[in-house]
Design a protein with these regions (language model features):
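Amphipathic alpha-helical repeat scaffolds of TPR domains
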Residues: 10-24, 48-68, 78-81, 85, ...
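TPR/TPR-like (Sel1-like) alpha-helical repeat modules
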Residues: 78-85, 117-135
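Conserved positions within tetratricopeptide repeat
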Residues: 35, 54, 74, 119-122, ...
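Boundary/linker segments of alpha-helical solenoid repeat arrays
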Residues: 49-51, 86-92, 130-141
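Solenoid-like repeat scaffolds
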Residues: 6-9, 42-49, 129-132
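Structural signature of alpha-solenoid helical repeat junctions
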Residues: 52, 72, 95-103, 133, ...
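Helix-turn-helix repeat elements of alpha-solenoid scaffolds
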Residues: 26-40, 70-88
Length: 148
């Protein structure tokens, strides 16, 4: 009797690498193709690790912002924030290196401002500043201070 071939189990960093690679290929075509890739990945990967979901939602936020879908962008930012703790625990060094280039804070602030949720935009400024992402977010916060 033949032995059953066990499915290969990828590591979380490998899964993240696959996500980024697929996104890079799709985004060359344009944001609509990137959105399609990300939505298909989200739908088909029911067991996607939460740490990778953080990055997926971040890419969704960027793509939806490029398409002017501010409500979708805001929802993606919420998803990224909900999975941020998992990314910190499972991909700590990768997240630390990637966070300055990620879109969730920048695009989240823009989305919430576009939707009139200035308090939410200020909260994102505070969280970005608390994570050490720099004076850029302090300046954004100062420019939104009138909303309080």
């Amino acid at each position: 009797m033949a032995r059953r071939i066990e499915p290969s189990k990828k590591s979380i960093p490998d899964i993240l690498g696959d996500l980024r690679s697929g996104y890079r290929e799709a985004v060359i075509i344009g944001p609509s193709a990137a959105l399609k890739f990300l939505e298909r990945t989200q739908e088909s990967q029911h067991s996607l690790p939460n740490a990778v979901k953080c990055f997926l939602f971040d890419l969704l936020a960027e793509t939806r912002a490029q398409l002017g879908d501010w409500e979708g962008c805001n929802e993606a930012v919420k998803g990224a924030l909900a999975n941020l703790a998992a990314a910190e625990s499972d991909l700590g060094a990768e997240l630390k290196n990637s966070l300055p280039g990620m879109s969730l804070f920048e695009r989240g602030i823009a989305a919430r401002s576009e939707l009139g949720d200035f308090e939410g935009a200020l909260q994102l400024c505070d969280e970005a500043t608390a994570r050490g992402l720099g004076a850029h977010f302090e300046a954004k916060r100062a420019s939104l201070a009138w909303a309080r």
